[in-house]
Regions:
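Surface-exposed coil/turn segments at beta-strand junctions on protein surfaces, enriched
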Residues: 112, 126, 156, 165-166
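C-terminal beta-strand-rich structural cap/linker in extracellular carbohydrate-active enzymes
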Residues: 157-178
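Hydrophobic, well-ordered secondary-structure elements that form the walls
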Residues: 119, 146, 168
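Short, glycine-/Ser/Thr-/acidic-enriched flexible segments
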Residues: 31, 60, 67, 114, ...
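Aromatic- and carboxylate-lined catalytic core of secreted/periplasmic carbohydrate-active enzymes
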Residues: 13-15, 20, 24-31, 35, ...
Length: 178
């Protein structure tokens, strides 16, 4: 499974090198524009890919035909907050990968060169999930505010991070100390 292979390359990042998770097959993947030529990844899976590539700082090489992008795909690849994470994340690593309520999840964090921390939560299972993550798991502590990078939703001084995830979905956050 491609997601599992990419989760395993987490140790490839370091000074002067980073993991290359390969191209992002988004939007129309051939120049013949019909429904049969679009990526087979769901919108949630595409968000998961962009989130993982960005927190790892893997090169963002698109494997779709840019001139045929729909609004979702264009917003996906031009999200300024996700692109900032891609540019500024450092020391990214998987904190844990575990089963919660019968569904496998992964938690990644990275420092932000401009201050604060990036957090990405992934649902690796085939069912939607709602989980709660203690701040200590995020390797950050009290006195933080955050923003979910895909929705813009604000998270103010949480004691834990409550996350609703679609099957194969992801959420990305930026936290700063007050």
């Amino acid at each position: 499974d491609r997601r599992q292979r990419q989760m395993c390359i987490r140790d490839s990042a370091g000074t002067g090198h980073w993991p290359d998770a390969d191209m992002l097959p988004v939007g129309p993947i051939r120049q013949v524009y019909d429904v049969n030529n679009w990526t087979n990844f769901t919108q949630d899976e595409q968000i998961t890919m962009l989130t993982l590539w960005s927190i790892m700082r893997s090169p963002l090489m698109l494997g779709g035909e840019l001139t045929g992008f729909d609004e979702f795909t264009m917003n996906l690849v031009t999200n300024s907050e996700i692109l900032a994470m891609h540019a500024n994340a450092r020391h990214s690593h998987q904190v844990w990968r575990r089963e919660i309520d019968g569904i496998e999840h992964a938690l990644w964090i990275a420092a932000d060169t401009k201050g604060g921390y990036y957090v990405a939560v992934f649902n690796l299972g085939d069912k939607d999930s709602d989980i709660s993550i203690p701040l200590a798991d995020l390797e950050i502590y009290d006195g933080v505010n955050g923003t979910e990078l895909w929705s813009g939703e604000h998270v103010e001084e949480p004691k834990s991070l409550s996350v609703s995830l679609k099957s194969h979905g992801a959420r990305a956050y930026h936290f700063t100390y007050n």
